[in-house]
Amino acid sequence: PRAELESIAKLRAEGRDAEADRALDAFRRDHPGYRIDDATWERVKPR
């Protein structure tokens, strides 16, 4: 899961928000119980 979140953060940093949104939706669907720490959430959350 950690690597997936890093990929999503990279998409956000590159301004590819639509792709990041889809990836985050898929991540949450695939890992429903995974708690995203606050620092990571700030990097991956929808904008």
PLM feature spans:
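Alpha-helix N-cap/N′ positions at the starts of helices
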Residues: 2-3
